[in-house]
Structures are given as C-alpha cells and as structure tokens.
Amino acid sequence: MSGKSLLLKVILLGDGGVGKSSLMNRYVTNKFDSQAFHTIGVEFLNRDLEVDGRFVTLQIWDTAGQERFKSLRTPFYRGADCCLLTFSVDDRQSFENLGNWQKEFIYYADVKDPEHFPFVVLGNKVDKEDRQVTTEEAQTWCMENGDYPYLETSAKDDTNVTVAFEEAVRQVLAVEEQLEHCMLGHTIDLNSGSKAGSSCC
C-alpha cells in the first residue's frame, strides 16, 4: 500500500463471551474458531486498509470482558481513537451492560469530550435464532446515549464485520475533519488582535 498511513487505535469492549475476539480475528485473518477461549487481559492485531481514499493502519485491541480482568484491560484504553461497544443479540444482560462499558471507557481513557468521541455499537451473533434484543431496542439505546452508529454483525457468518471496522475508521476521520475545520475557523487577525471566522466547537 502506497502513501502515508494513519495509525488508528480501536478498542473492542463488552461482556465476556459476546464475540469480540471472533470479530477481530474474522476481520484480520478471515477465520472463525467456534472453540475460541475467553481473552485474558488484552490482545491486539493490525490490519491495513483504505477508506474513502485514506490509507489507515488499524490497531485493534480486544479486551477481556470479565470483571476480574478490569485492572489488566483499563490501562490500554488511553490513546484509543474509537471504541466499539459490543453486545450479543442473544444475551440481554450484555446489552444492558453497554452503559457501564461506555462509562468505564470514558473514565479510564480520560476522554476530554465524551459527547464527540467516536463510539460504534455492534450487536453481534445475529446468526443466532434465540434473539433477546431487537434491532429497534439497540437503535433506541444508540440514539439516547450519543447518537452512535449501530451495526448488527456475525463473526461466524462474516456479516457486516468489514463494514463495522470501516465505519469505525469513518467515525474517527469525521471527528478529525471537524476538528481541523474548527481550527481553520479560529484564525487571528494580527493587525487588530481580533479573531476572525466563526467557531464551530
């Protein structure tokens, strides 16, 4: 891949067993292991991609969802460019815990502007028949908690996996573009000492 690549750090967060490792492995290696064990601590994989003409190296961090691994995973939140809040559509509790994961990330990642931080919500395991969370419920949660993009995925069937990670990149680039626009709008007239342009931040 030619051209300068932008390094983006993306964190997968959610309860243990919702399929975070499977999503990461499906996206990076295009493999699915139905016998995969729970993650202990953190793991990460890289993948290069091009989104809307931008070359990106995506560094995907998969974190252990169990409470006992909290002290191992939280130091790795810092420096994240995007967070993929993940639940399993056949596990109602994992959906109800999304708010806790959101708060944990914002606190430990030391997010300065939570309202504009790029979160993407993934409802995984849509290949399962015994669904406990409807699409409408998940979309409503996303609208009420930050107007986040919502995608339904299946690492097993490779449903929307690539789309999900590309959406994460687009969300980061959109925030970056907005910040650049704001900075350009804050030009200063050196002669009068007054600011020119309007603020969008």
From Swiss-Prot:
A GO BP term here is: protein transport
The domain-related comment in the record is: Switch 1, switch 2 and the interswitch regions are characteristic of Rab GTPases and mediate the interactions with Rab downstream effectors. The switch regions undergo conformational changes upon nucleotide binding which drives interaction with specific sets of effector proteins, with most effectors only binding to GTP-bound Rab.
Q: Which UniProt keywords apply?
A: Cell membrane, Cytoplasmic vesicle, GTP-binding, Hydrolase, Lipoprotein, Membrane, Nucleotide-binding, Phosphoprotein, Prenylation, Protein transport, Transport
- Similarity field: Belongs to the small GTPase superfamily. Rab family.
Instruction: Decide whether keyword Cell membrane is in the record.
Output: yes
- Which GO MF terms does the UniProt record name? G protein activity; GDP binding; GTP binding; identical protein binding
Q: Which residues bind Mg(2+)?
A: 21, 39, 62
Domain of life, source organism: Eukaryota
**Which principal EC class is assigned to this enzyme?**
hydrolase
Described by its record, this protein's role is as follows: The small GTPases Rab are key regulators of intracellular membrane trafficking, from the formation of transport vesicles to their fusion with membranes. Rabs cycle between an inactive GDP-bound form and an active GTP-bound form that is able to recruit to membranes different sets of downstream effectors directly responsible for vesicle formation, movement, tethering and fusion. RAB9B is involved in the transport of proteins between the endosomes and the trans Golgi network.
Relate the assembly described in the record: Interacts (GTP-bound form) with SGSM1; the GDP-bound form has much lower affinity for SGSM1. The GTP-bound form but not the GDP-bound form interacts with HPS4 and the BLOC-3 complex (heterodimer of HPS1 and HPS4) but does not interact with HPS1 alone. Interacts (GTP-bound form) with NDE1.
How is this protein named in the record?
Ras-related protein Rab-9B
PROSITE patterns found in the cross-reference section: RAB
Which catalytic reaction applies to this protein?
A: GTP + H2O = GDP + phosphate + H(+)
Q: For the lipid attachment S-geranylgeranyl cysteine, which residues are annotated?
A: 200-201
Family matches, as Pfam families: Ras
Write the Enzyme Commission number(s) for this entry. 3.6.5.2
Short motif (Switch 1): ranges: 31-42
Query: Where does this protein come from, organism-wise?
Result: Homo sapiens
